[in-house]
Swiss-Prot record:
InterPro entries tied to this protein: Elp3/MiaA/NifB-like_rSAM, Methylthiotransferase, Methylthiotransferase_CS, Methylthiotransferase_N, Methylthiotransferase_N_sf, MiaB_methiolase, rSAM, rSAM_horseshoe
Record lineage: Bacteria, Pseudomonadati, Pseudomonadota, Gammaproteobacteria, Alteromonadales
MTTase N-terminal domain segment(s): 3-120
Known partners and oligomeric status: Monomer.
Protein role: Catalyzes the methylthiolation of N6-(dimethylallyl)adenosine (i(6)A), leading to the formation of 2-methylthio-N6-(dimethylallyl)adenosine (ms(2)i(6)A) at position 37 in tRNAs that read codons beginning with uridine.
Domain annotation Radical SAM core: ranges: 143-375
Keyword tags: 4Fe-4S, Cytoplasm, Iron, Iron-sulfur, Metal-binding, S-adenosyl-L-methionine, Transferase, tRNA processing
Family of this protein: Belongs to the methylthiotransferase family. MiaB subfamily.
Protein name (database record): tRNA-2-methylthio-N(6)-dimethylallyladenosine synthase
Binding site for [4Fe-4S] cluster 2: C157, C161, C164
Length: 473
Protein backbone atom coordinates (compact mmCIF):
# COMPACT_ATOMS: atom_id res chain seq x y z
CA UNK A 1 0.00 0.00 0.00
CA UNK A 2 1.36 3.42 -0.99
CA UNK A 3 2.55 5.76 1.73
CA UNK A 4 0.84 9.14 1.90
CA UNK A 5 2.41 12.60 2.05
CA UNK A 6 1.02 15.96 3.14
CA UNK A 7 3.00 19.17 2.52
CA UNK A 8 1.88 22.49 4.01
CA UNK A 9 3.48 25.55 2.44
CA UNK A 10 3.87 29.11 3.68
CA UNK A 11 5.57 31.95 1.87
CA UNK A 12 6.80 32.89 -1.57
CA UNK A 13 6.66 31.25 -5.00
CA UNK A 14 10.09 29.74 -4.31
CA UNK A 15 8.58 27.83 -1.39
CA UNK A 16 5.71 26.67 -3.59
CA UNK A 17 8.25 25.45 -6.13
CA UNK A 18 10.28 23.68 -3.43
CA UNK A 19 7.16 22.00 -2.04
CA UNK A 20 6.20 20.68 -5.46
CA UNK A 21 9.71 19.27 -5.81
CA UNK A 22 9.43 17.55 -2.42
CA UNK A 23 6.23 15.84 -3.53
CA UNK A 24 7.67 14.87 -6.93
CA UNK A 25 10.87 13.55 -5.35
CA UNK A 26 9.15 11.40 -2.74
CA UNK A 27 6.70 10.09 -5.33
CA UNK A 28 9.44 9.11 -7.78
CA UNK A 29 11.75 7.54 -5.18
CA UNK A 30 9.33 5.96 -2.72
CA UNK A 31 5.89 6.10 -4.33
CA UNK A 32 4.40 8.61 -1.89
CA UNK A 33 0.96 9.88 -2.85
CA UNK A 34 0.08 13.46 -1.91
CA UNK A 35 -3.04 13.96 0.22
CA UNK A 36 -4.90 17.14 1.11
CA UNK A 37 -5.32 16.50 4.83
CA UNK A 38 -2.54 15.87 7.36
CA UNK A 39 -4.77 13.39 9.20
CA UNK A 40 -4.53 11.01 6.24
CA UNK A 41 -0.74 11.16 5.84
CA UNK A 42 2.17 8.98 6.93
CA UNK A 43 4.61 11.88 6.46
CA UNK A 44 3.75 15.55 7.05
CA UNK A 45 6.12 18.33 5.99
CA UNK A 46 5.87 22.02 6.87
CA UNK A 47 7.68 24.32 4.42
CA UNK A 48 8.17 27.57 6.31
CA UNK A 49 8.83 31.26 5.64
CA UNK A 50 10.66 33.62 7.99
CA UNK A 51 10.05 36.93 6.22
CA UNK A 52 7.13 38.13 8.32
CA UNK A 53 6.72 38.85 12.03
CA UNK A 54 6.15 36.00 14.48
CA UNK A 55 7.05 33.40 11.86
CA UNK A 56 8.59 31.17 14.52
CA UNK A 57 5.49 31.21 16.73
CA UNK A 58 3.31 30.42 13.74
CA UNK A 59 5.43 27.32 13.13
CA UNK A 60 5.09 26.11 16.72
CA UNK A 61 1.32 26.61 16.67
CA UNK A 62 1.09 24.40 13.57
CA UNK A 63 3.43 21.81 15.07
CA UNK A 64 1.26 21.74 18.20
CA UNK A 65 -1.68 20.65 16.06
CA UNK A 66 0.41 17.97 14.37
CA UNK A 67 1.68 16.73 17.75
CA UNK A 68 -1.87 15.61 18.52
CA UNK A 69 -1.89 13.57 15.31
CA UNK A 70 1.28 11.81 16.40
CA UNK A 71 -0.30 10.77 19.69
CA UNK A 72 -2.84 8.73 17.73
CA UNK A 73 -0.34 7.70 15.02
CA UNK A 74 3.08 7.15 16.67
CA UNK A 75 4.78 6.26 13.37
CA UNK A 76 3.81 9.58 11.79
CA UNK A 77 6.94 11.35 10.48
CA UNK A 78 6.92 15.13 11.03
CA UNK A 79 9.38 17.33 9.14
CA UNK A 80 10.00 21.07 9.18
CA UNK A 81 11.77 22.72 6.25
CA UNK A 82 12.24 26.14 4.71
CA UNK A 83 13.69 29.34 6.06
CA UNK A 84 12.46 29.08 9.67
CA UNK A 85 14.01 25.62 9.88
CA UNK A 86 17.28 27.00 8.54
CA UNK A 87 17.28 29.89 10.99
CA UNK A 88 15.71 28.28 14.06
CA UNK A 89 16.66 24.61 13.80
CA UNK A 90 17.92 24.36 17.39
CA UNK A 91 14.81 26.06 18.76
CA UNK A 92 12.58 23.65 16.87
CA UNK A 93 14.42 20.65 18.31
CA UNK A 94 14.25 22.14 21.81
CA UNK A 95 10.60 23.24 21.84
CA UNK A 96 9.20 20.48 19.63
CA UNK A 97 11.21 17.30 20.31
CA UNK A 98 8.53 15.24 18.58
CA UNK A 99 9.67 16.68 15.23
CA UNK A 100 11.62 14.01 13.36
CA UNK A 101 13.29 15.98 10.56
CA UNK A 102 14.59 19.55 10.31
CA UNK A 103 15.88 20.49 6.85
CA UNK A 104 16.79 23.69 5.03
CA UNK A 105 15.83 24.96 1.57
CA UNK A 106 19.05 23.57 0.10
CA UNK A 107 18.73 20.05 1.52
CA UNK A 108 15.21 19.03 0.51
CA UNK A 109 16.72 16.63 -2.04
CA UNK A 110 17.93 14.50 0.88
CA UNK A 111 14.41 13.91 2.20
CA UNK A 112 14.16 10.25 1.07
CA UNK A 113 17.29 9.38 3.06
CA UNK A 114 16.18 11.46 6.05
CA UNK A 115 12.76 9.80 6.19
CA UNK A 116 14.36 6.37 5.88
CA UNK A 117 16.65 7.11 8.83
CA UNK A 118 13.70 8.13 10.99
CA UNK A 119 11.65 5.10 10.00
CA UNK A 120 14.60 2.86 10.89
CA UNK A 121 14.56 4.39 14.38
CA UNK A 122 17.89 6.15 13.98
CA UNK A 123 16.61 9.26 15.74
CA UNK A 124 16.01 12.84 14.70
CA UNK A 125 17.68 14.09 11.51
CA UNK A 126 18.81 17.72 11.17
CA UNK A 127 20.40 19.08 7.97
CA UNK A 128 20.24 22.82 7.34
CA UNK A 129 23.51 23.11 5.41
CA UNK A 130 24.06 25.05 2.17
CA UNK A 131 25.39 22.49 -0.37
CA UNK A 132 25.13 25.11 -3.13
CA UNK A 133 23.15 23.89 -6.13
CA UNK A 134 23.37 20.18 -5.33
CA UNK A 135 19.64 19.80 -4.73
CA UNK A 136 18.79 20.40 -8.40
CA UNK A 137 21.05 17.52 -9.46
CA UNK A 138 19.01 15.11 -7.35
CA UNK A 139 15.46 16.07 -8.29
CA UNK A 140 13.24 14.13 -10.71
CA UNK A 141 11.94 15.38 -14.05
CA UNK A 142 9.38 18.14 -13.48
CA UNK A 143 5.67 17.35 -13.60
CA UNK A 144 3.35 19.92 -15.12
CA UNK A 145 0.15 20.85 -13.31
CA UNK A 146 -1.78 22.94 -15.78
CA UNK A 147 -0.63 25.47 -18.34
CA UNK A 148 1.63 27.47 -16.00
CA UNK A 149 4.76 26.44 -14.12
CA UNK A 150 7.53 27.79 -11.92
CA UNK A 151 11.19 27.11 -12.72
CA UNK A 152 13.91 28.01 -10.23
CA UNK A 153 17.00 29.49 -11.90
CA UNK A 154 19.03 30.41 -8.82
CA UNK A 155 19.13 30.26 -5.03
CA UNK A 156 20.03 32.73 -2.32
CA UNK A 157 20.95 36.41 -2.32
CA UNK A 158 24.22 38.30 -1.82
CA UNK A 159 22.82 41.81 -1.46
CA UNK A 160 22.41 41.77 2.35
CA UNK A 161 19.70 44.41 2.67
CA UNK A 162 19.65 45.42 6.33
CA UNK A 163 16.10 44.10 6.96
CA UNK A 164 16.29 40.79 5.10
CA UNK A 165 16.96 37.26 6.37
CA UNK A 166 17.29 35.57 2.97
CA UNK A 167 21.13 35.54 2.79
CA UNK A 168 21.18 33.88 6.20
CA UNK A 169 18.45 31.30 5.52
CA UNK A 170 19.01 30.45 1.84
CA UNK A 171 22.68 31.36 1.49
CA UNK A 172 24.42 33.55 -1.06
CA UNK A 173 23.59 33.63 -4.76
CA UNK A 174 24.16 30.42 -6.70
CA UNK A 175 22.93 30.12 -10.30
CA UNK A 176 21.82 26.91 -11.97
CA UNK A 177 23.67 26.00 -15.17
CA UNK A 178 22.01 27.29 -18.33
CA UNK A 179 21.51 23.81 -19.79
CA UNK A 180 19.70 22.61 -16.66
CA UNK A 181 17.23 25.49 -16.77
CA UNK A 182 16.53 25.10 -20.50
CA UNK A 183 16.02 21.36 -20.16
CA UNK A 184 13.50 21.81 -17.34
CA UNK A 185 11.56 24.40 -19.34
CA UNK A 186 11.56 22.17 -22.43
CA UNK A 187 10.35 19.20 -20.36
CA UNK A 188 7.48 21.31 -19.02
CA UNK A 189 6.61 22.55 -22.51
CA UNK A 190 6.44 18.92 -23.64
CA UNK A 191 3.73 18.44 -21.01
CA UNK A 192 1.63 21.37 -22.22
CA UNK A 193 2.96 24.27 -20.17
CA UNK A 194 2.50 27.57 -22.02
CA UNK A 195 3.62 30.08 -19.38
CA UNK A 196 6.78 29.85 -17.28
CA UNK A 197 7.74 32.00 -14.29
CA UNK A 198 11.48 32.05 -13.59
CA UNK A 199 12.19 32.12 -9.86
CA UNK A 200 14.98 33.38 -7.67
CA UNK A 201 15.56 35.71 -4.74
CA UNK A 202 17.28 38.06 -7.20
CA UNK A 203 16.89 36.74 -10.74
CA UNK A 204 18.56 39.78 -12.32
CA UNK A 205 21.93 38.65 -10.96
CA UNK A 206 21.69 35.24 -12.65
CA UNK A 207 25.01 34.07 -14.13
CA UNK A 208 24.61 30.47 -15.19
CA UNK A 209 27.47 28.31 -16.39
CA UNK A 210 27.30 27.22 -20.03
CA UNK A 211 28.52 23.97 -21.58
CA UNK A 212 31.66 25.65 -22.95
CA UNK A 213 32.82 27.13 -19.64
CA UNK A 214 31.37 30.60 -20.24
CA UNK A 215 28.49 32.23 -18.33
CA UNK A 216 25.00 33.27 -19.39
CA UNK A 217 23.42 36.51 -18.14
CA UNK A 218 19.79 36.87 -17.14
CA UNK A 219 19.02 38.85 -20.30
CA UNK A 220 20.46 36.04 -22.43
CA UNK A 221 18.54 33.44 -20.42
CA UNK A 222 15.26 35.26 -21.07
CA UNK A 223 15.84 35.08 -24.82
CA UNK A 224 16.80 31.40 -24.67
CA UNK A 225 13.68 30.46 -22.71
CA UNK A 226 11.44 32.56 -24.96
CA UNK A 227 12.80 30.67 -27.99
CA UNK A 228 11.43 27.33 -26.78
CA UNK A 229 8.33 26.55 -28.83
CA UNK A 230 5.23 26.06 -26.74
CA UNK A 231 6.35 28.71 -24.25
CA UNK A 232 4.36 31.74 -25.35
CA UNK A 233 4.40 33.70 -22.11
CA UNK A 234 7.32 34.41 -19.78
CA UNK A 235 7.43 35.97 -16.30
CA UNK A 236 10.00 36.24 -13.53
CA UNK A 237 10.30 37.14 -9.84
CA UNK A 238 11.95 38.61 -7.84
CA UNK A 239 14.14 41.45 -9.10
CA UNK A 240 16.46 43.99 -7.53
CA UNK A 241 16.74 47.45 -9.12
CA UNK A 242 20.54 47.53 -8.75
CA UNK A 243 20.88 44.58 -11.15
CA UNK A 244 18.21 45.70 -13.61
CA UNK A 245 20.55 46.28 -16.55
CA UNK A 246 20.17 47.94 -19.94
CA UNK A 247 20.47 44.46 -21.44
CA UNK A 248 17.35 43.34 -19.57
CA UNK A 249 15.45 46.42 -20.75
CA UNK A 250 16.49 45.59 -24.33
CA UNK A 251 14.83 42.17 -24.00
CA UNK A 252 11.49 43.92 -23.45
CA UNK A 253 11.98 45.61 -26.80
CA UNK A 254 12.50 42.47 -28.90
CA UNK A 255 10.95 39.56 -26.97
CA UNK A 256 7.14 39.56 -27.13
CA UNK A 257 6.90 36.43 -24.97
CA UNK A 258 8.02 38.54 -21.99
CA UNK A 259 4.80 39.84 -20.44
CA UNK A 260 3.74 43.48 -20.07
CA UNK A 261 4.00 43.21 -16.30
CA UNK A 262 6.97 43.73 -14.00
CA UNK A 263 7.36 43.20 -10.27
CA UNK A 264 10.31 45.40 -9.23
CA UNK A 265 10.52 45.90 -5.44
CA UNK A 266 11.56 49.38 -4.31
CA UNK A 267 10.58 49.08 -0.58
CA UNK A 268 10.50 52.87 0.07
CA UNK A 269 10.38 56.21 -1.73
CA UNK A 270 12.84 58.01 0.54
CA UNK A 271 16.55 58.02 -0.29
CA UNK A 272 17.34 58.27 3.41
CA UNK A 273 15.36 55.13 4.20
CA UNK A 274 16.72 53.30 1.15
CA UNK A 275 20.24 54.01 2.40
CA UNK A 276 19.36 52.69 5.86
CA UNK A 277 17.93 49.59 4.20
CA UNK A 278 21.20 49.19 2.25
CA UNK A 279 19.27 48.89 -0.99
CA UNK A 280 22.11 50.30 -3.09
CA UNK A 281 20.02 52.58 -5.31
CA UNK A 282 18.19 55.91 -5.16
CA UNK A 283 14.63 56.90 -5.98
CA UNK A 284 15.87 58.77 -9.07
CA UNK A 285 17.61 55.65 -10.36
CA UNK A 286 14.45 53.60 -9.87
CA UNK A 287 12.37 56.20 -11.73
CA UNK A 288 14.88 56.21 -14.58
CA UNK A 289 14.69 52.44 -14.95
CA UNK A 290 10.90 52.50 -15.16
CA UNK A 291 10.98 55.41 -17.63
CA UNK A 292 13.36 53.56 -19.95
CA UNK A 293 11.21 50.43 -19.72
CA UNK A 294 8.10 52.39 -20.66
CA UNK A 295 9.90 53.78 -23.70
CA UNK A 296 10.17 50.28 -25.15
CA UNK A 297 6.95 48.90 -23.56
CA UNK A 298 4.43 51.76 -23.13
CA UNK A 299 1.72 49.29 -22.02
CA UNK A 300 3.84 47.86 -19.18
CA UNK A 301 2.28 47.82 -15.70
CA UNK A 302 4.43 47.68 -12.57
CA UNK A 303 4.03 46.23 -9.09
CA UNK A 304 6.33 46.57 -6.10
CA UNK A 305 7.05 45.72 -2.46
CA UNK A 306 6.86 48.29 0.33
CA UNK A 307 7.99 48.11 3.94
CA UNK A 308 6.04 50.50 6.15
CA UNK A 309 7.48 51.95 9.36
CA UNK A 310 11.14 51.07 8.91
CA UNK A 311 13.24 52.37 11.86
CA UNK A 312 13.34 56.17 11.95
CA UNK A 313 10.82 56.56 9.11
CA UNK A 314 9.35 60.06 9.46
CA UNK A 315 6.12 61.50 8.09
CA UNK A 316 8.20 63.16 5.37
CA UNK A 317 9.82 59.84 4.42
CA UNK A 318 6.38 58.27 4.11
CA UNK A 319 5.11 61.20 2.03
CA UNK A 320 8.02 60.62 -0.36
CA UNK A 321 6.99 56.98 -0.67
CA UNK A 322 3.44 58.07 -1.51
CA UNK A 323 4.82 60.51 -4.09
CA UNK A 324 6.72 57.68 -5.76
CA UNK A 325 3.61 55.48 -5.80
CA UNK A 326 1.70 58.21 -7.59
CA UNK A 327 4.58 58.96 -9.97
CA UNK A 328 5.04 55.35 -11.10
CA UNK A 329 1.30 54.56 -10.90
CA UNK A 330 1.88 51.08 -9.45
CA UNK A 331 -0.82 48.58 -10.35
CA UNK A 332 -0.41 46.32 -7.31
CA UNK A 333 1.88 45.96 -4.32
CA UNK A 334 2.92 43.65 -1.52
CA UNK A 335 3.07 46.03 1.42
CA UNK A 336 3.78 45.11 5.02
CA UNK A 337 4.43 46.69 8.38
CA UNK A 338 8.11 46.49 9.32
CA UNK A 339 9.02 43.92 11.94
CA UNK A 340 12.48 43.08 13.21
CA UNK A 341 14.00 39.88 11.86
CA UNK A 342 16.50 38.32 14.28
CA UNK A 343 20.06 38.29 13.01
CA UNK A 344 19.67 41.15 10.53
CA UNK A 345 21.48 44.52 10.88
CA UNK A 346 18.14 46.34 11.10
CA UNK A 347 17.28 44.33 14.21
CA UNK A 348 19.88 46.42 16.06
CA UNK A 349 18.14 49.66 15.07
CA UNK A 350 15.53 51.15 17.41
CA UNK A 351 12.05 50.19 16.22
CA UNK A 352 10.85 53.71 16.97
CA UNK A 353 7.76 54.02 14.75
CA UNK A 354 4.67 53.19 16.78
CA UNK A 355 2.45 50.31 15.72
CA UNK A 356 -0.51 52.67 15.40
CA UNK A 357 1.47 54.92 13.03
CA UNK A 358 2.56 51.92 10.98
CA UNK A 359 -1.04 50.72 10.65
CA UNK A 360 -2.25 54.17 9.59
CA UNK A 361 0.46 54.53 6.96
CA UNK A 362 -0.16 51.02 5.65
CA UNK A 363 -3.88 51.73 5.25
CA UNK A 364 -3.16 54.97 3.37
CA UNK A 365 -0.67 53.27 1.06
CA UNK A 366 -2.89 50.29 0.30
CA UNK A 367 -5.87 52.55 -0.38
CA UNK A 368 -3.82 54.55 -2.90
CA UNK A 369 -2.59 51.42 -4.66
CA UNK A 370 -6.16 50.08 -4.80
CA UNK A 371 -7.39 53.31 -6.41
CA UNK A 372 -4.63 53.18 -9.00
CA UNK A 373 -5.32 49.52 -9.72
CA UNK A 374 -8.99 50.25 -10.31
CA UNK A 375 -8.05 53.10 -12.63
CA UNK A 376 -5.77 50.85 -14.68
CA UNK A 377 -8.55 48.25 -14.80
CA UNK A 378 -11.13 50.75 -16.06
CA UNK A 379 -8.82 51.71 -18.92
CA UNK A 380 -8.87 48.08 -20.04
CA UNK A 381 -12.63 48.17 -20.76
CA UNK A 382 -13.18 47.84 -24.50
CA UNK A 383 -9.68 46.51 -25.15
CA UNK A 384 -8.93 43.02 -26.44
CA UNK A 385 -6.67 41.05 -24.11
CA UNK A 386 -4.94 37.73 -24.69
CA UNK A 387 -5.89 35.30 -21.92
CA UNK A 388 -4.20 32.08 -20.89
CA UNK A 389 -7.19 29.95 -19.91
CA UNK A 390 -6.54 28.26 -16.55
CA UNK A 391 -9.82 26.42 -16.03
CA UNK A 392 -13.47 26.81 -15.04
CA UNK A 393 -14.45 29.96 -13.18
CA UNK A 394 -14.67 29.55 -9.42
CA UNK A 395 -17.97 31.40 -9.33
CA UNK A 396 -19.60 29.64 -12.27
CA UNK A 397 -18.23 26.32 -13.52
CA UNK A 398 -20.02 26.87 -16.82
CA UNK A 399 -17.68 29.80 -17.49
CA UNK A 400 -13.91 29.96 -17.95
CA UNK A 401 -11.25 32.03 -16.26
CA UNK A 402 -7.72 33.00 -17.13
CA UNK A 403 -5.15 35.75 -16.74
CA UNK A 404 -4.07 38.69 -18.81
CA UNK A 405 -0.42 39.60 -19.30
CA UNK A 406 -0.77 42.13 -16.47
CA UNK A 407 -2.00 39.37 -14.15
CA UNK A 408 -5.72 40.27 -14.08
CA UNK A 409 -8.22 37.44 -13.65
CA UNK A 410 -10.85 37.43 -16.41
CA UNK A 411 -14.09 35.41 -16.37
CA UNK A 412 -15.89 34.76 -19.66
CA UNK A 413 -18.15 32.33 -21.50
CA UNK A 414 -16.26 29.99 -23.79
CA UNK A 415 -15.51 26.47 -24.94
CA UNK A 416 -13.95 24.36 -22.17
CA UNK A 417 -11.64 22.86 -24.80
CA UNK A 418 -9.79 26.18 -24.61
CA UNK A 419 -8.43 25.32 -21.14
CA UNK A 420 -4.65 25.29 -21.24
CA UNK A 421 -4.51 27.51 -24.32
CA UNK A 422 -4.86 31.15 -25.30
CA UNK A 423 -7.96 33.10 -26.30
CA UNK A 424 -8.55 36.74 -27.12
CA UNK A 425 -11.23 38.38 -24.99
CA UNK A 426 -12.79 41.84 -25.12
CA UNK A 427 -12.96 43.35 -21.63
CA UNK A 428 -16.55 44.36 -20.84
CA UNK A 429 -16.66 44.91 -17.05
CA UNK A 430 -14.10 45.59 -14.32
CA UNK A 431 -14.66 44.72 -10.67
CA UNK A 432 -12.39 45.01 -7.63
CA UNK A 433 -11.00 41.48 -7.80
CA UNK A 434 -11.95 40.28 -11.25
CA UNK A 435 -12.81 41.27 -14.79
CA UNK A 436 -15.50 40.08 -17.19
CA UNK A 437 -14.90 39.62 -20.88
CA UNK A 438 -16.40 38.45 -24.17
CA UNK A 439 -14.75 35.71 -26.23
CA UNK A 440 -13.35 37.02 -29.54
CA UNK A 441 -11.10 34.31 -31.00
CA UNK A 442 -9.25 31.11 -30.17
CA UNK A 443 -5.75 29.91 -30.94
CA UNK A 444 -6.68 28.60 -34.38
CA UNK A 445 -7.24 32.20 -35.47
CA UNK A 446 -4.07 33.57 -33.86
CA UNK A 447 -0.68 33.97 -35.45
CA UNK A 448 1.21 31.96 -32.84
CA UNK A 449 4.45 30.21 -33.72
CA UNK A 450 4.14 26.81 -35.33
CA UNK A 451 4.21 24.21 -32.59
CA UNK A 452 7.06 21.71 -32.72
CA UNK A 453 8.33 19.34 -30.08
CA UNK A 454 10.18 21.40 -27.45
CA UNK A 455 12.69 18.55 -27.15
CA UNK A 456 13.82 19.48 -30.66
CA UNK A 457 14.86 22.91 -29.41
CA UNK A 458 17.83 21.38 -27.60
CA UNK A 459 20.49 19.11 -29.02
CA UNK A 460 21.83 16.43 -26.75
CA UNK A 461 25.58 16.04 -26.74
CA UNK A 462 27.50 13.46 -24.77
CA UNK A 463 30.85 14.63 -23.42
CA UNK A 464 33.86 12.53 -22.46
CA UNK A 465 32.39 11.91 -19.02
CA UNK A 466 29.24 10.48 -20.60
CA UNK A 467 27.21 13.31 -19.08
CA UNK A 468 24.48 14.80 -21.24
CA UNK A 469 24.47 18.55 -21.75
CA UNK A 470 21.82 20.57 -23.54
CA UNK A 471 22.72 23.34 -25.96
CA UNK A 472 20.21 25.69 -27.63
CA UNK A 473 19.83 24.84 -31.29
Amino acid sequence: MSMKLHVKTWGCQMNEYDSSKMADLLNSTNGYISVEHAEDADVVLLNTCSIREKAQEKVFHQLGRWKKLKVNKPNLVIGVGGCVASQEGKAIRSRAPFVDIVFGPQTLHRLPEMIKEVQENKGTVVDVSFPEIEKFDSLPEPKADGATAFVSIMEGCSKYCSFCVVPYTRGEEVSRPLDDVLLEVAQLAEQGVREVTLLGQNVNSYLGATYDGDTCSFAELLRFVASIDGIDRLRYVTSNPIDFSDEIIAVYEDTPELVNFLHLPVQAGSDRILAAMKRGHTVAQYKDQIARLLQVRPELTVSSDFIIGFPNETDHDFEQTMDLIKYINFDTSYSFIYSQRPGTPAADMPDDVTLETKKQRLAILQDRIQQQSQGIGRKMVGSVQRILVEGPSRKNIMELCGRTENNRIVNFEGDHRSIGGFVDVEITEVHTNSIRGKFIRGEAEMNLRESIRPSDIVNKHENKSAVNSYIPA
